[in-house]
C-alpha cells in the first residue's frame, strides 16, 4: 500500500520504518527539514533500538522517502497516517493545533484528488476529537463527505519507547476505530500478517480504549508504589508482596473486577481498604490513590441514586439487597446504601432478594441492616411479580439470572436501571432501560 505518515517523532518514525520494512511504499512527512534529511540518509530522528536499520533498509530498497511537501505526499499515496504530537495544555486539556493543521493540509489536497483517500488518526486524542474536530475540518477543506468520498479511521498505538519495534511486530492487539466499513477494511489489510487479534470498533470507542490503557498503566504504577511505601513503613519488602500478588492470574491480574458497574461492598473490601489507609495515615505515609477508593465508591452509589431521581417516578423496585447474588450478606452492601438514600428522599421502595429473608437474618448481618434501615422487614417482598408490577422504576442490583430478561425487554410503562451489565447493548430497543456506565 502507498502510505504517507505525518509527523516523524517517536510514533511516526517507528511506523515509517516498520511499514516500509514490510514492503509498503511509505512517504514520511514533517515540517522539520532536519528530520527529513535524517530519514532520507537512513538515519533515525529518535533514539530507538533497531529503528535505524529499518530506515536504512527502507531507503536502500526505495520503499521509504521523506519530504516536507504535504500536498505531494498526499497525492502520491492512498492512505495517510496522522502521527503528530498532542501535548498537554497548562490546564491539562489536549493541544490540537498540530492535528488541526495537518487535517487542513490533507483536506485542501483531497478537494482535487479523484481517488478515494483514507485518513487514519494514530495520534492519541480524546473521545469525540475525530467526530468533532478532524472530520469537520477535512469535510470543510475538501468539500467532500467522510465515509463517502474519503475514509476516516482511528488506529491507537501501543508502542513503548525503547521496545517500539518489538511492540509493533508483536502487539497484544490491533484496535481499529472505523467511521465506515470500507475505512476499516483498508486499515485492517495493513495488519493481517501480524499475529494479534484485530478489534474493530466505533471511532469514539477506539479513542477511549487508548486512554483507558494508558491510565490503567499509570494506575498500576501508582498502586504498586503506594503499597510499597506502606509495606516499607510496616517493615515489609513491598517487592516481595507484589511478586506474590502478581502470581494470582485468576483474580488479581485478570478480567475479574474489570467490568464497569456498581460499587463494591461486602464484609471484606470496604473494611480492609479503610484499615490499610488508616494505618498508612497513622504512619504518615501518603497514599492518595488508596485514599480515594472509598470516596469513589460512594460516588458510584450517588450516581445510581441520581439516575433514579432523574425520572418523574416515585415507586421504585430494588432487585437485590445483598452485596452480590447468591448470598444473604448485607454488610456494607452498596445496595443497602442506595436503599437508605432512596428512603431518605421519600421514594416508595419495595425490595426483592430471594436470598434475604428477614426472619433468617441474624447476628452482625441483622445488626447492620437494622442500623441502616430499621423497618427493612416492611420493605422486603418475596412476590417477584408484585414487586415489578407495583413499581415505576426497576433497579437491577445484582446478577440474579431472573433479572436479566428485564434489562433487554423492559415491562410496559416502566423504566429499568441496570447496575450489573445485563443489557446486551448500551441502549435498549425501546429506550426505557439504562445502564449505570453504558
Curated annotation (Swiss-Prot):
Keywords: Alginate biosynthesis, NAD, Oxidoreductase. Its EC number is 1.1.1.132. It comes from the Bacteria. It catalyses: GDP-alpha-D-mannose + 2 NAD(+) + H2O = GDP-alpha-D-mannuronate + 2 NADH + 3 H(+). GDP-alpha-D-mannuronate binds at residues 161, 210, 214, 217, 225, 256-257, 259, 262, 265, 324. InterPro entries: 6-PGluconate_DH-like_C_sf (IPR008927), GDPman_DH (IPR028358), NAD(P)-bd_dom_sf (IPR036291), UDP-Glc/GDP-Man (IPR017476), UDP-Glc/GDP-Man_DH_C (IPR014027), UDP-Glc/GDP-Man_DH_C_sf (IPR036220), UDP-Glc/GDP-Man_DH_dimer (IPR014026), UDP-Glc/GDP-Man_DH_N (IPR001732). Pfam families: UDPG_MGDP_dh (PF00984), UDPG_MGDP_dh_C (PF03720), UDPG_MGDP_dh_N (PF03721). Pathway: Glycan biosynthesis; alginate biosynthesis. One of its GO terms (molecular function) is NAD binding. The active site is at residue 268. GO terms for biological process: alginic acid biosynthetic process. NAD(+) binds at residues 10-11, 30, 35, 86, 124, 271, 331. SUPFAM superfamilies: 6-phosphogluconate dehydrogenase C-terminal domain-like, NAD(P)-binding Rossmann-fold domains, UDP-glucose/GDP-mannose dehydrogenase C-terminal domain. Catalyzes the oxidation of guanosine diphospho-D-mannose (GDP-D-mannose) to GDP-D-mannuronic acid, a precursor for alginate polymerization. The alginate layer causes a mucoid phenotype and provides a protective barrier against host immune defenses and antibiotics. Belongs to the UDP-glucose/GDP-mannose dehydrogenase family. This is GDP-mannose 6-dehydrogenase. The lineage of its organism: Bacteria, Pseudomonadati, Pseudomonadota, Gammaproteobacteria, Pseudomonadales.
Amino acid at each position: 500500500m502507498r502510505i504517507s505518515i505525518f509527523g516523524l517523532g517517536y510514533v511516526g518514525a517507528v511506523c515509517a520504518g516498520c511499514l516500509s520494512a514490510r514492503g509498503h511504499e511509505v512517504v514520511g512527512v514533517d515540517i522539520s527539514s532536519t528530520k527529513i534529511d535524517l530519514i532520507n540518509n537512513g538515519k533515525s530522528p529518535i533514539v530507538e533500538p533497531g529503528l535505524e536499520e529499518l530506515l536504512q533498509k527502507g531507503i536502500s530498497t526505495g520503499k521509504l522517502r521523506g519530504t516536507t511537501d504535504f500536498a505531494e505526499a498526499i497525492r502520491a499515496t492512498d492512505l495517510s497516517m496522522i502521527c503528530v504530537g498532542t501535548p498537554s495544555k497548562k490546564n491539562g486539556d489536549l493541544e490540537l493545533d498540530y492535528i488541526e493543521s495537518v487535517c487542513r493540509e490533507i483536506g485542501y489536497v483531497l478537494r482535487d484528488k479523484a481517488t478515494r483517500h483514507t485518513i487514519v488518526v494514530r495520534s492519541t486524542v480524546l473521545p469525540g476529537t475525530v467526530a468533532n474536530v478532524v472530520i469537520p475540518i477535512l469535510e470543510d477543506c475538501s468539500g467532500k463527505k467522510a465515509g463517502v468520498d474519503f475514509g476516516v479511521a482511528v488506529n491507537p498505538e501501543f508502542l513503548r519507547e525503547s521496545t517500539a519495534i518489538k511492540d509493533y511486530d508483536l502487539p497484544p492487539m490491533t484496535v481499529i476505530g472505523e467511521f465506515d466499513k470500507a475505512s476499516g477494511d483498508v486499515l485492517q489489510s495493513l495488519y493481517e500478517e501480524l499475529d494479534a487479534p484485530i478489534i474493530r470498533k466505533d471511532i469514539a470507542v477506539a479513542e477511549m480504549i487508548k486512554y483507558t490503557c494508558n491510565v490503567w498503566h499509570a494506575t498500576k504504577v501508582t498502586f504498586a508504589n503506594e503499597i510499597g511505601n506502606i509495606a516499607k513503613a510496616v517493615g515489609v519488602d513491598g517487592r516481595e508482596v507484589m511478586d506474590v500478588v502478581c502470581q494470582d492470574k485468576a483474580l488479581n491480574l485478570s478480567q475479574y473486577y474489570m467490568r464497569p458497574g456498581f460499587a463494591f461492598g461486602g464484609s471484606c473490601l470496604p473494611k480492609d481498604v479503610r484499615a490499610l489507609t488508616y494505618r498508612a495515615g497513622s504512619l504518615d505515609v501518603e497514599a492518595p490513590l488508596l485514599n480515594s477508593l472509598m470516596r469513589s465508591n460512594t460516588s458510584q452509589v450517588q450516581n445510581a441514586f441520581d439516575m433514579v431521581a432523574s425520572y418523574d417516578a416515585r415507586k421504585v423496585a430494588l432487585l437485590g439487597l445483598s452485596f452480590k447474588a447468591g448470598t444473604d450478606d448485607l454488610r456494607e452492601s452498596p445496595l443497602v446504601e442506595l436503599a437508605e438514600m432512596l428512603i431518605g428522599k421519600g421514594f416508595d421502595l419495595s425490595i426483592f432478594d430471594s436470598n434475604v429473608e428477614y426472619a433468617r437474618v441474624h447476628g452482625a448481618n441483622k445488626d447492620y441492616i437494622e442500623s441502616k434501615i430499621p423497618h427493612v422487614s416492611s420493605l422486603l417482598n418475596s412476590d417477584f411479580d408484585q414487586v415489578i408490577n407495583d413499581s415505576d422504576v426497576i433497579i437491577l442490583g445484582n446478577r440474579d439470572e431472573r433479572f436479566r430478561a428485564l434489562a433487554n425487554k423492559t415491562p410496559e410503562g416502566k423504566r429499568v436501571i441496570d447496575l450489573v451489565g445485563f443489557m446486551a447493548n448500551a441502549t435498549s430497543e425501546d429506550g426505557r432501560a439504562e445502564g449505570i456506565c453504558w
